């Protein structure tokens, strides 16, 4: 079973150079390593590397880069990676490919990742401890479900990584693999437009749970990758991060309703109840303990609410000037 690796990257030259070298040392190695680079300048090392299919893109848009990379792929299995990973077990590819062979209904496979993120350090601690009884009551009041590991629920809420091998509802973005014949069906143009407007978050969840319409997703719990605590390309400010992450939960709610046969009306209703409660909680927090960070968080929530009412999440409304079909075929 042949496989290609696709890596969207943006302004992480040292990381992507190191990671591609690590991939080439694995056995088996991919048929092709496809790097879709939206950096400010071209990566001459990768451009001149005969082992790399190097595509320079003008769009800093991760789902677009994923879909563009698939157009250059030839193998049956496509493995998507983030650009800032380290491989800690060189048998990663044999594990992924052998998992597909276990069951013909498996359409997606991932592996364990030692994941660290720097985003949380940009926010202040909550006034109420997240583990307190009051916090749990507030979560339940706002409609945040208690989700089991490996599962996803309304609002795109996930239950954390599954620590045993097994079927899951979603993948984490640093490592996702799918059968090639479904990729164009699970990365819709609406998602590209959402990210083009810098209003998208959680594209890994949207893509992977959409794949469940076509078969099973399987996660290998063994750690094969390490994701260091690098600066996120998604974090520009508290305001923009909260706005895009909250607005995107409406998109994830629609995908969740479609894939899991839930009432779209009820899922949208749950979204607006959630955002109303979050605005209320953020307002109280700001009054009790004022800070510029809490102020920006509240502004982001209000902006997301406004967008959810006024801006439909489809390509015609988000990016009427872009024809994705023509762009991807050129």
At which residue positions do the language-model features occur?
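Active-site donor/metal-binding and catalytic loop motifs
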Residues: 189-201, 216-238, 249-252
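A conserved acidic beta->alpha catalytic loop
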Residues: 22, 35-45, 85-86
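Glycine-rich, basic loop-to-helix element that forms the pyrophosphate-binding segment
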Residues: 57-73
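Short aromatic/hydrophobic "clamp" motif used to bind/position activated sugar donors
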Residues: 78
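Short, well-formed alpha-helical segments that are part of the catalytic scaffolds
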Residues: 11-25
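Conserved donor NDP-sugar-binding/catalytic core segment of glycosyltransferases
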Residues: 91-141
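Acidic donor-binding loop at a coil-to-helix junction in glycosyltransferase catalytic cores
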Residues: 171-173, 194-207
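Non-catalytic, C-terminal membrane-associated alpha-helical segments of glycosyltransferases
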Residues: 240-248, 259-330
